Swiss-Prot record:
Disulfide bonds: 108-135, 121-147
Glycan-carrying positions: 40, 204, 228, 238, 257, 268
Predominant place of localization: secreted
GO cellular component: extracellular region
Originating species: Zaire ebolavirus (strain Mayinga-76)
Signal peptide: 1-32
Record keywords, A-Z: Disulfide bond, Glycoprotein, Secreted, Signal
Protein name as annotated: Super small secreted glycoprotein
Family indicated by similarity: Belongs to the filoviruses glycoprotein family.
Length: 298
Protein backbone atom coordinates (compact mmCIF):
# COMPACT_ATOMS: atom_id res chain seq x y z
CA UNK A 1 0.00 0.00 0.00
CA UNK A 2 1.28 3.44 -0.87
CA UNK A 3 1.16 6.54 1.23
CA UNK A 4 -0.41 9.72 -0.13
CA UNK A 5 0.33 13.20 1.17
CA UNK A 6 -0.27 16.82 0.21
CA UNK A 7 2.87 18.37 -1.23
CA UNK A 8 3.32 22.03 -0.26
CA UNK A 9 5.68 23.85 -2.58
CA UNK A 10 7.14 27.36 -2.47
CA UNK A 11 4.91 29.39 -4.76
CA UNK A 12 7.63 31.77 -5.86
CA UNK A 13 9.38 28.88 -7.59
CA UNK A 14 6.54 28.57 -10.06
CA UNK A 15 5.80 32.00 -11.42
CA UNK A 16 4.21 32.27 -14.79
CA UNK A 17 6.64 32.72 -17.59
CA UNK A 18 5.70 33.74 -21.05
CA UNK A 19 7.52 34.51 -24.17
CA UNK A 20 6.59 35.33 -27.71
CA UNK A 21 8.25 34.31 -30.89
CA UNK A 22 7.71 36.24 -34.06
CA UNK A 23 8.50 34.12 -37.06
CA UNK A 24 8.75 35.90 -40.36
CA UNK A 25 8.83 33.66 -43.37
CA UNK A 26 9.80 35.41 -46.58
CA UNK A 27 9.03 33.86 -49.91
CA UNK A 28 9.87 35.30 -53.30
CA UNK A 29 6.72 36.24 -55.13
CA UNK A 30 7.45 33.76 -57.88
CA UNK A 31 8.19 30.94 -55.41
CA UNK A 32 4.79 29.28 -55.13
CA UNK A 33 4.68 26.13 -52.99
CA UNK A 34 1.25 24.48 -52.84
CA UNK A 35 0.99 22.17 -49.85
CA UNK A 36 -0.89 18.90 -49.73
CA UNK A 37 -1.45 16.83 -46.60
CA UNK A 38 -1.66 13.05 -46.59
CA UNK A 39 -4.23 11.80 -44.09
CA UNK A 40 -4.37 8.11 -43.18
CA UNK A 41 -1.86 7.19 -45.89
CA UNK A 42 -4.58 7.88 -48.48
CA UNK A 43 -2.34 9.51 -51.09
CA UNK A 44 -2.52 7.19 -54.09
CA UNK A 45 -0.54 7.17 -57.32
CA UNK A 46 -3.66 8.42 -59.11
CA UNK A 47 -3.69 11.51 -56.87
CA UNK A 48 -0.12 12.30 -57.84
CA UNK A 49 -0.99 11.76 -61.50
CA UNK A 50 -3.77 14.34 -61.25
CA UNK A 51 -1.31 16.87 -59.86
CA UNK A 52 1.16 16.11 -62.62
CA UNK A 53 -1.48 17.07 -65.16
CA UNK A 54 -1.74 20.57 -63.69
CA UNK A 55 0.65 23.37 -64.48
CA UNK A 56 2.13 23.41 -60.97
CA UNK A 57 3.69 19.97 -61.23
CA UNK A 58 5.37 18.63 -64.32
CA UNK A 59 7.29 15.82 -62.67
CA UNK A 60 7.12 13.80 -59.48
CA UNK A 61 10.69 14.96 -58.90
CA UNK A 62 9.13 18.24 -57.77
CA UNK A 63 7.49 16.52 -54.78
CA UNK A 64 9.20 16.66 -51.40
CA UNK A 65 7.62 14.94 -48.39
CA UNK A 66 7.77 16.48 -44.93
CA UNK A 67 6.49 15.50 -41.49
CA UNK A 68 4.44 18.14 -39.67
CA UNK A 69 3.89 17.79 -35.92
CA UNK A 70 0.37 18.05 -34.48
CA UNK A 71 1.58 20.17 -31.58
CA UNK A 72 2.04 22.96 -34.10
CA UNK A 73 -1.76 23.02 -34.33
CA UNK A 74 -2.05 23.66 -30.61
CA UNK A 75 -3.25 20.23 -29.47
CA UNK A 76 -2.89 19.41 -25.77
CA UNK A 77 0.42 17.63 -25.26
CA UNK A 78 0.21 16.53 -21.61
CA UNK A 79 0.21 12.76 -21.17
CA UNK A 80 -3.39 12.34 -19.91
CA UNK A 81 -4.73 14.38 -22.85
CA UNK A 82 -2.45 12.98 -25.56
CA UNK A 83 -3.11 9.34 -24.71
CA UNK A 84 -6.87 9.91 -25.09
CA UNK A 85 -6.20 10.43 -28.80
CA UNK A 86 -4.90 6.86 -29.18
CA UNK A 87 -6.85 3.63 -29.09
CA UNK A 88 -6.49 -0.11 -29.72
CA UNK A 89 -8.09 -1.83 -32.72
CA UNK A 90 -7.89 -5.23 -34.38
CA UNK A 91 -8.28 -6.25 -37.99
CA UNK A 92 -6.63 -3.15 -39.47
CA UNK A 93 -3.14 -3.66 -40.90
CA UNK A 94 -0.59 -0.96 -40.09
CA UNK A 95 0.71 1.31 -42.83
CA UNK A 96 4.09 3.01 -43.08
CA UNK A 97 5.08 5.93 -45.30
CA UNK A 98 8.43 7.67 -45.51
CA UNK A 99 9.11 11.40 -45.40
CA UNK A 100 12.25 13.34 -46.24
CA UNK A 101 12.36 16.12 -43.65
CA UNK A 102 10.72 16.90 -40.33
CA UNK A 103 10.37 19.47 -37.59
CA UNK A 104 11.92 19.50 -34.15
CA UNK A 105 9.34 18.40 -31.58
CA UNK A 106 8.72 19.90 -28.17
CA UNK A 107 6.91 16.80 -26.86
CA UNK A 108 7.41 13.16 -27.86
CA UNK A 109 6.15 9.93 -26.31
CA UNK A 110 7.51 6.46 -25.62
CA UNK A 111 5.23 3.64 -24.42
CA UNK A 112 6.00 0.37 -22.61
CA UNK A 113 2.57 -1.07 -21.76
CA UNK A 114 1.81 -4.64 -20.69
CA UNK A 115 -1.42 -6.57 -20.24
CA UNK A 116 -2.36 -7.79 -16.75
CA UNK A 117 -1.00 -11.25 -17.66
CA UNK A 118 2.41 -9.75 -18.40
CA UNK A 119 2.26 -10.00 -22.19
CA UNK A 120 3.13 -7.00 -24.35
CA UNK A 121 0.44 -4.62 -25.59
CA UNK A 122 2.49 -3.05 -28.36
CA UNK A 123 4.50 -4.68 -31.16
CA UNK A 124 8.23 -4.23 -31.46
CA UNK A 125 9.35 -1.77 -34.10
CA UNK A 126 10.16 -3.39 -37.46
CA UNK A 127 13.72 -3.23 -38.74
CA UNK A 128 14.57 0.24 -39.97
CA UNK A 129 12.16 2.14 -37.73
CA UNK A 130 14.02 4.27 -35.18
CA UNK A 131 12.73 6.79 -32.68
CA UNK A 132 11.92 10.38 -33.62
CA UNK A 133 15.35 12.03 -33.50
CA UNK A 134 14.62 15.55 -32.20
CA UNK A 135 12.52 15.83 -29.04
CA UNK A 136 12.90 18.42 -26.30
CA UNK A 137 10.86 16.31 -23.86
CA UNK A 138 10.28 12.56 -24.13
CA UNK A 139 7.29 11.45 -22.05
CA UNK A 140 8.06 7.80 -21.28
CA UNK A 141 5.01 5.91 -20.01
CA UNK A 142 5.28 2.45 -18.45
CA UNK A 143 2.42 0.48 -16.98
CA UNK A 144 -0.50 -1.84 -17.63
CA UNK A 145 -3.79 -1.79 -19.48
CA UNK A 146 -6.38 -4.10 -21.06
CA UNK A 147 -5.16 -3.22 -24.58
CA UNK A 148 -8.25 -4.52 -26.37
CA UNK A 149 -6.79 -4.77 -29.85
CA UNK A 150 -3.77 -5.79 -31.88
CA UNK A 151 -2.42 -2.30 -32.55
CA UNK A 152 -2.70 1.20 -31.11
CA UNK A 153 -3.95 3.66 -33.74
CA UNK A 154 -4.56 7.41 -33.74
CA UNK A 155 -8.28 8.10 -33.25
CA UNK A 156 -8.09 11.33 -35.27
CA UNK A 157 -6.37 9.72 -38.25
CA UNK A 158 -2.93 11.21 -37.71
CA UNK A 159 0.40 9.44 -38.02
CA UNK A 160 2.95 8.50 -35.41
CA UNK A 161 6.16 10.06 -36.69
CA UNK A 162 9.40 8.14 -36.26
CA UNK A 163 12.81 8.85 -37.80
CA UNK A 164 11.87 9.73 -41.41
CA UNK A 165 9.16 7.06 -41.33
CA UNK A 166 5.54 7.61 -40.33
CA UNK A 167 3.32 4.75 -39.19
CA UNK A 168 -0.36 4.44 -38.37
CA UNK A 169 0.51 2.44 -35.22
CA UNK A 170 2.58 2.82 -32.04
CA UNK A 171 5.62 0.59 -31.56
CA UNK A 172 6.86 -0.59 -28.18
CA UNK A 173 9.64 1.45 -26.60
CA UNK A 174 10.11 3.60 -29.71
CA UNK A 175 9.90 7.38 -29.36
CA UNK A 176 7.40 9.12 -31.63
CA UNK A 177 5.76 12.47 -32.27
CA UNK A 178 2.18 12.91 -33.45
CA UNK A 179 1.84 14.39 -36.90
CA UNK A 180 0.87 14.19 -40.55
CA UNK A 181 2.88 13.78 -43.73
CA UNK A 182 2.67 16.55 -46.29
CA UNK A 183 4.25 17.11 -49.64
CA UNK A 184 5.70 20.29 -51.03
CA UNK A 185 5.37 21.00 -54.72
CA UNK A 186 8.46 22.83 -55.90
CA UNK A 187 8.37 25.16 -58.92
CA UNK A 188 10.99 22.96 -60.52
CA UNK A 189 12.95 19.95 -59.43
CA UNK A 190 15.73 21.14 -57.11
CA UNK A 191 18.27 18.59 -56.00
CA UNK A 192 19.55 20.98 -53.36
CA UNK A 193 16.18 21.78 -51.76
CA UNK A 194 17.16 19.79 -48.68
CA UNK A 195 20.82 20.64 -49.00
CA UNK A 196 21.90 20.28 -45.38
CA UNK A 197 23.32 16.97 -44.25
CA UNK A 198 21.13 14.88 -41.92
CA UNK A 199 21.61 15.75 -38.27
CA UNK A 200 23.78 13.21 -36.51
CA UNK A 201 21.94 10.69 -34.42
CA UNK A 202 21.57 11.50 -30.72
CA UNK A 203 23.68 9.46 -28.32
CA UNK A 204 21.59 7.84 -25.59
CA UNK A 205 18.80 10.30 -26.48
CA UNK A 206 20.61 13.22 -24.84
CA UNK A 207 23.47 15.35 -26.08
CA UNK A 208 25.48 18.25 -24.75
CA UNK A 209 23.26 21.38 -24.63
CA UNK A 210 26.04 23.28 -26.39
CA UNK A 211 25.36 21.22 -29.50
CA UNK A 212 22.03 22.97 -29.92
CA UNK A 213 20.08 19.80 -29.17
CA UNK A 214 19.11 18.63 -25.71
CA UNK A 215 16.48 16.07 -24.76
CA UNK A 216 14.98 15.33 -21.35
CA UNK A 217 13.09 12.13 -20.53
CA UNK A 218 10.19 12.41 -18.09
CA UNK A 219 8.93 9.10 -16.70
CA UNK A 220 5.40 8.09 -15.74
CA UNK A 221 3.56 5.03 -14.43
CA UNK A 222 0.11 4.19 -15.80
CA UNK A 223 -2.62 1.83 -14.65
CA UNK A 224 -5.67 1.06 -16.75
CA UNK A 225 -3.95 2.47 -19.84
CA UNK A 226 -6.35 3.15 -22.70
CA UNK A 227 -9.47 3.24 -20.52
CA UNK A 228 -11.57 6.07 -19.12
CA UNK A 229 -10.20 5.26 -15.67
CA UNK A 230 -6.51 5.57 -16.50
CA UNK A 231 -4.41 6.84 -13.60
CA UNK A 232 -0.99 8.38 -14.12
CA UNK A 233 1.85 8.95 -11.67
CA UNK A 234 4.89 11.13 -12.33
CA UNK A 235 7.95 9.10 -11.33
CA UNK A 236 10.55 10.82 -9.14
CA UNK A 237 12.32 7.56 -8.30
CA UNK A 238 11.24 3.93 -8.07
CA UNK A 239 9.46 4.56 -4.74
CA UNK A 240 8.43 8.23 -4.97
CA UNK A 241 5.63 9.43 -7.22
CA UNK A 242 3.32 12.41 -7.75
CA UNK A 243 -0.27 12.15 -8.94
CA UNK A 244 -0.22 13.52 -12.48
CA UNK A 245 -2.59 16.27 -13.58
CA UNK A 246 -3.15 17.70 -17.05
CA UNK A 247 -2.16 21.16 -15.83
CA UNK A 248 1.45 20.10 -15.14
CA UNK A 249 3.83 21.38 -17.83
CA UNK A 250 7.13 19.59 -18.48
CA UNK A 251 8.99 22.52 -16.93
CA UNK A 252 6.87 22.28 -13.79
CA UNK A 253 7.54 18.55 -13.48
CA UNK A 254 11.28 19.09 -13.76
CA UNK A 255 11.26 21.73 -11.02
CA UNK A 256 8.92 19.56 -8.96
CA UNK A 257 11.42 16.71 -9.27
CA UNK A 258 14.26 18.99 -8.15
CA UNK A 259 12.23 20.34 -5.23
CA UNK A 260 11.36 16.86 -3.97
CA UNK A 261 15.02 15.84 -4.09
CA UNK A 262 16.39 18.96 -2.40
CA UNK A 263 13.70 19.13 0.29
CA UNK A 264 14.01 15.49 1.33
CA UNK A 265 10.48 14.53 0.26
CA UNK A 266 11.46 11.19 -1.30
CA UNK A 267 10.37 7.89 0.19
CA UNK A 268 12.78 6.82 2.93
CA UNK A 269 11.22 3.39 3.38
CA UNK A 270 10.71 0.35 1.17
CA UNK A 271 7.12 1.44 0.52
CA UNK A 272 5.77 3.57 -2.31
CA UNK A 273 5.18 7.24 -1.46
CA UNK A 274 2.65 9.14 -3.59
CA UNK A 275 2.40 12.91 -3.31
CA UNK A 276 -0.51 15.08 -4.44
CA UNK A 277 0.27 18.69 -5.39
CA UNK A 278 -1.74 21.29 -3.48
CA UNK A 279 -4.50 22.57 -5.83
CA UNK A 280 -3.59 26.16 -4.90
CA UNK A 281 -0.07 25.84 -6.28
CA UNK A 282 0.42 27.73 -9.54
CA UNK A 283 1.77 25.18 -12.03
CA UNK A 284 1.92 27.44 -15.08
CA UNK A 285 5.70 27.71 -15.23
CA UNK A 286 6.78 27.49 -18.86
CA UNK A 287 4.54 26.68 -21.77
CA UNK A 288 3.41 23.47 -23.38
CA UNK A 289 4.85 24.75 -26.63
CA UNK A 290 6.02 28.20 -27.61
CA UNK A 291 3.34 28.57 -30.28
CA UNK A 292 0.39 27.51 -28.15
CA UNK A 293 -1.85 30.16 -26.64
CA UNK A 294 -2.79 29.01 -23.17
CA UNK A 295 -6.48 29.34 -22.32
CA UNK A 296 -7.11 31.61 -19.36
CA UNK A 297 -9.57 30.37 -16.72
CA UNK A 298 -12.87 32.24 -16.58
Amino acid sequence: MGVTGILQLPRDRFKRTSFFLWVIILFQRTFSIPLGVIHNSTLQVSDVDKLVCRDKLSSTNQLRSVGLNLEGNGVATDVPSATKRWGFRSGVPPKVVNYEAGEWAENCYNLEIKKPDGSECLPAAPDGIRGFPRCRYVHKVSGTGPCAGDFAFHKEGAFFLYDRLASTVIYRGTTFAEGVVAFLILPQAKKDFFSSHPLREPVNATEDPSSGYYSTTIRYQATGFGTNETEYLFEVDNLTYVQLESRFTPQFLLQLNETIYTSGKRSNTTGKLIWKVNPEIDTTIGEWAFWETKKKPH
